[in-house]
A protein has these predicted regions:
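Hydrophobic beta-strand anchors of alpha/beta hydrolase catalytic cores
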Residues: 59-60, 92, 137
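Soluble periplasmic/extracytoplasmic beta-strand elements of cell-envelope proteins
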Residues: 61, 94-96, 148
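Structural microenvironment flanking redox-active thiols in thiol-disulfide oxidoreductases
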Residues: 71-111, 121-127
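Short pre-active-site segment immediately N-terminal to redox-active cysteine/selenocysteine motifs
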Residues: 56-58, 62-66, 133
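N-terminal targeting signals for export/organelle localization
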Residues: 1-40, 148, 156-163, 168-169
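Thiol/disulfide oxidoreductase modules built on the thioredoxin-like
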Residues: 54, 106-113, 121-166
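A short beta-strand-turn-helix
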Residues: 37-58
Length: 169
């Protein structure tokens, strides 16, 4: 047993290091803000996510045209934007990662995406987040703080969106 204890300690420490990183949580002392990075619009202009959200709660979906899982979420995001987000001080925003705006615009048109789209052509936004994985979902409160980060659109992200909307101004 004496030889096993150091091995077990190393094994437990290694297993703990392999977990996914903790999602950023907004706190009164040090909220994690959305990166102030310039993103392309589908028309080729530039803006920042905070400017597009304009003081509204935002559900942000990071995606790519080649991502099959991302495509499965898009119909749900269209419905969410048309029902839950509309009229409640919230907005759904898609951010394509690593592609050029013309390609993304054509894809969005073919897919019938009605929610706002931005493009992170040079990975500056996702690199500032420390997260290149797609699909990924963020919920951003009215003050630009990231209050939820997850791998995909699911019950946890929808609950975070509901809480952020309910929190009011």
């Amino acid at each position: 047993m004496g030889h096993r204890l150091p091995f077990l300690v190393v094994l437990v420490l290694a297993a703990g290091a392999c977990g996914t990183p903790e999602a950023p949580r907004a706190s009164s002392s040090s909220p994690v803000q959305v990166p102030a990075v310039s993103l392309s619009t589908l028309a080729g202009d530039h803006t920042e996510l905070a400017r597009l959200a304009d003081g509204r709660v935002a559900l942000v979906s990071l995606w790519a045209t080649w991502c099959e899982s991302c495509g499965k979420e898009m119909d749900a995001l269209n419905r969410l934007d048309a029902t839950t987000a509309a009229g409640r001080g919230a907005v759904v925003i898609g951010i394509d990662v690593g592609e050029e705006p013309g390609k993304v615009a054509e894809f969005a048109r073919r897919r019938g995406l009605r929610y706002a789209q931005l493009v992170d052509e040079d990975f500056a936004f996702v690199d500032a987040l420390g997260q290149r994985r797609v699909p990924s979902t963020l919920v951003v409160d009215r003050h630009g703080s990231i209050v939820f980060r997850g791998d995909a659109l699911d019950g946890r992200s929808l609950e975070a969106l509901r809480r952020a909307i309910a929190a009011g101004p």
